[in-house]
Swiss-Prot record:
Gene Ontology molecular function: any one: ATP binding
NCBIfam families in UniProt: glyQ, PRK09348.1
InterPro entries hit by this protein: aa-tRNA-synth_II/BPL/LPL (IPR045864), Gly-tRNA-synth_heterodimer (IPR006194), Gly-tRNA_ligase_asu (IPR002310)
Single GO cellular component term: cytosol
Alphabetical list of PANTHER family matching this protein: GLYCINE--TRNA LIGASE, CHLOROPLASTIC_MITOCHONDRIAL 2, GLYCYL-TRNA SYNTHETASE
Lineage: Bacteria, Pseudomonadati, Pseudomonadota, Gammaproteobacteria, Enterobacterales
Protein name: Glycine--tRNA ligase alpha subunit
Length: 300
């Protein structure tokens, strides 16, 4: 049991855990299949293989999931109240895109007891791009009282393949939504869960030490020589697998994701010159495009 448990009465529907449960239930009722997160270190929910492969081709998809995400360069040693190197996203992927998708999203906020009439909710144009995945889309940031809480994207390309039909991706920033709902100014004060005896576990109880230690590792103590070797080897393995007769595309994609993670760790320590960085991104993107192209051909 955590030593710094606190006792106070509150509505458990406002906990971080209940926010996830509410979103899962809501999107399940909109005919989304609730799946599990990808068990690999990724920078965003978009990297989930169900999203990458699911957006390619004409087969309909409708899925939602929580994804643990890592961006090593965003670490702040636990000192920034709303900036993290490890965080959680709730991802919704639907193809073809429903005509009322924005209404569905706003209704999901209502389920979280976020009043769309009394709060300032704005869709701010912000077209999205992921160079390593060869992906881009048209969309918006959703601001809640001046803070970005969601990214709303209509995918145009993934892996260099035109998306037809268009896929809609909704990415909820769970930490910031929880901060708003619980009226907290610091993410580490957000209540993650409350048991039947009113014992409370905060976000800080669970993740503050992790954030501090990983920030130190990412910026100071990571073995860059090892990580560069792993980056190259995983990218090489991804390309090697694709050359096999049976085209093992899912394993190839996994090794691509591993290589991207090590690239991000190296990038956090600023180990690349501008030219080197662009060259590596191009090599990663070329591999992702080959995976996407081979997958697209198999769907025909």
């Amino acid at each position: 049991m955590l030593s710094n448990f606190k006792k106070e009465k509150m509505n458990t529907s406002t906990t971080f855990y209940e926010i996830i449960c509410t979103l899962e239930k809501y999107w399940h009722n909109q005919n989304c299949t609730i799946i599990e997160p990808l068990d690999i270190s990724v920078g965003a929910g978009t990297f989930h293989n169900k999203t990458f492969f699911g957006t390619i081709g004409s087969k309909p998809i409708s899925m939602a999931y929580v994804q643990s995400s890592r961006r090593p360069s965003d670490g702040r040693y636990g000192k920034n109240p709303n900036r993290l190197q490890h965080y959680y996203q709730f991802q919704v992927i639907i193809k073809p895109s429903p005509h009322n998708i924005q209404c569905l999203y706003l209704n999901s906020l209502k389920k979280l007891n976020i009043d769309c009439k009394t709060n300032d909710i704005r869709f701010v144009e912000d077209n999205w791009e992921n160079p390593t995945l060869g992906a881009w889309g048209q969309g918006w940031e959703v601001w809640l009282n001046g803070m970005e809480v969601t990214q709303f994207t209509y995918f145009q390309q993934v892996g260099g393949i035109n998306c037809n039909p268009i896929t809609t991706e909704i990415t909820y920033g769970l930490e910031r939504i929880a901060m708003h709902i619980q009226n907290k100014s610091n993410i580490y004060d957000v209540i993650w869960n409350q048991d039947m005896n009113n014992n409370i576990i905060t976000y800080g109880d669970l993740f503050l030490n992790n954030e501090i230690e990983h920030s130190s590792y990412n910026f100071k103590y990571a073995d860059s020589k090892l990580h560069f070797d792993l980056f190259e080897k995983h990218l090489q393995e991804s390309n090697r697998i694709m050359k096999l007769f049976n085209n093992l595309l899912f394993p190839a994609y996994e090794h691509l994701i591993y290589s991207i993670h090590y690239f991000n760790l190296l990038d956090a320590k600023k180990k690349f010159s501008t030219t080197q960085r662009q060259t590596h991104i191009l090599n990663i993107r070329n591999t992702s495009k080959m995976i996407a192209t081979n997958y697209y051909k198999k769907q025909k």
